[in-house]
């Protein structure tokens, strides 16, 4: 895509996550890659889950390992519950622990009419975007300790809806409610759960979802007049994963360039 999404190459870490390990779904590109890079710069070992974008995943791996930490690449389909359990186990086996789970992977399809959404598309969108988060979170929690963190990528569309992403928006609403609920359930164990709700962000999903006019106008309706970059969305994931976010749980952090200004 042109221009390429901006990644946080100039960020200077301060060991906020030193000694921790993280599993990030959709970590091969976009927000997931930016989060992986920041976590590495803050001292965490990182496991990357992705479908089949092996070249992209290798780019992320190289960037992570350049920071002197480990990176584990874990390809496969997160629609499969057994694969999700395997992701968690392989992360624990490789790093000895799992402190941070970032449920980030998602798919979306432009459909202007409800009748155009097939049953198969609806089911797949929920399986990738939401069911995987249930599978992964359920598998991860037994390995997590007090102070550990679960972070899910929601969306501005969970709050305002979107007439061309009806099924996608519904999954993001489900993620928001699920995150708030598990935050309440896991508080007694000292495990925090939060979400980040991006607005328009310049990732590979955009040119694969929109036509040329849609890509050109993407993000122009925000107060900032442009889409956000992955590097601009990734910082809240560091806060929520670190001890500096120790009093934050059950919350959604909105990063949307002013596209949504209501509570």
Residue ranges and their predicted role:
Residues 8-9, 111, 160, 238, ...:
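Short C-terminal tail/terminal secondary-structure segment
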Residues 54, 75-88, 119, 231-232:
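The beta1-alpha1 cofactor-binding region of Rossmann-like NAD(H)/NADP(H)-dependent oxidoreductases
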Residues 112-114, 118-126, 218:
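Substrate-binding pocket helix/loop in short-chain dehydrogenase/reductase
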Residues 137, 171, 179:
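Active-site helix of classical SDR
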Residues 142-143, 184-188, 246:
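Alpha-helical segment proximal to the catalytic Tyr-Lys
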Residues 155:
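Residue(s) in the substrate-gating loop at a strand-loop-helix junction
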Residues 222-233, 244:
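A conserved structural motif in NAD(P)-dependent oxidoreductases
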């Amino acid at each position: 895509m042109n221009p390429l999404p901006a990644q946080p190459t100039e960020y200077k870490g301060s060991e906020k996550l030193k000694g921790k390990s993280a599993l990030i779904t959709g970590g091969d590109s976009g927000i997931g890659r930016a989060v992986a890079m920041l976590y590495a710069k803050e001292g965490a070992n990182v496991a990357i889950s992705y479908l089949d974008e092996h070249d992209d995943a290798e780019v992320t791996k190289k960037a992570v390992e350049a920071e002197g930490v480990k990176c584990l690449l874990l390809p496969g389909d997160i629609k499969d519950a057994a694969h999700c359990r395997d992701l968690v186990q392989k992360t624990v086996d490789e790093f000895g622990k799992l402190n941070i789970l970032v449920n980030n992977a998602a798919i979306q399809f432009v459909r202007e009419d409800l009748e155009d959404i097939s049953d198969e598309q609806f089911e797949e969108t929920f399986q990738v975007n939401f069911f995987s988060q249930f599978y992964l979170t359920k598998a991860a929690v037994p390995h997590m300790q007090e102070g550990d963190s679960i972070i899910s990528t929601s969306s501005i569309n969970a709050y305002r809806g979107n007439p061309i992403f009806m099924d996608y928006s519904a999954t993001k609403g489900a993620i928001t409610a699920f995150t708030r609920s598990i935050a309440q359930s896991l508080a007694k164990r000292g495990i925090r759960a939060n979400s980040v709700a991006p607005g328009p962000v310049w990732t590979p999903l955009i040119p694969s979802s929109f036509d040329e006019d849609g890509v050109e106008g993407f993000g122009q309706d925000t107060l900032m007049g442009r889409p956000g970059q992955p590097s601009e969305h990734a910082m809240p994931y560091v806060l929520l994963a670190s001890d500096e976010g120790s009093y934050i749980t059950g919350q959604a952090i909105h990063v949307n360039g002013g596209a949504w200004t209501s509570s």
